[in-house]
Regions:
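N-terminal membrane-targeting hydrophobic helices
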Residues: 1-101
Length: 101
């Protein structure tokens, strides 16, 4: 889809799309999306890949646009991390109360 929208070939954008879906290695179901499929994940991807990528046609393409399109394609909108985690119970270990020194 990125190549159809922005030109070039799919391989021009594969590294970015693979980055978003890399969390499947840790959590191989739809919950993997909670890790990067959010406004914060898009911010992180822009830090990793830069503001633009240059496709094989020499055209500069916004990384933010590519990432937003990926998340919208998967979820229909761009959630915030707060939206992902608002119903997640807070466990005692999350505050470091179970640290072993």
């Amino acid at each position: 889809i990125s190549a159809k929208m922005h030109g070039g070939v799919p391989e021009d954008y594969l590294e970015i799309h693979n980055f978003f879906d890399s969390s499947k290695a840790a959590l191989p179901d739809v919950r993997h999306r909670a890790i990067l499929h959010s406004s914060f994940g898009i911010f992180v991807a822009e830090k990793v890949f830069g503001v633009t990528v240059t496709n094989s046609e020499g055209k500069k393409v916004s990384v933010r646009d590519l990432c937003e399109e990926h998340v919208i394609q998967d979820l229909g909108f761009i959630p915030t991390p707060e939206r992902w985690f608002k119903n997640m119970p807070i466990e005692p270990w999350m505050s470091g109360s179970k640290k072993k020194l």
